[in-house]
Amino acid sequence: MSDVVTLRVAIEAHGEPVSELTLRRPTVQEVRAIKALPYKIDKSEEVSLDMDVAAKYIAVCAGIPPSSVNQLDLADLNALSWAVASFFS
């Protein structure tokens, strides 16, 4: 399973301009290596994103370097983070 996300603002990855990213599901090995979920559930059962962790998953699942994740527009970061979180439900 994978999700294609069209970016509002293009970034550069591997020396090339990128206007869409394909996110694949993380493997169990990758989840264990990151050691955290991309979201948190509080006492009232509200879900919120953990953006630092989500950024790690975006890099891994999209196959781009962390420096490219840092170039993302905030709206794109939010959309990609929720897409990553959806892999865990």
Question: Where do the model's predicted regions map?
Answer:
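Short, surface-exposed, charged amphipathic helix/loop patches that serve as local interaction elements
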Residues: 2-89
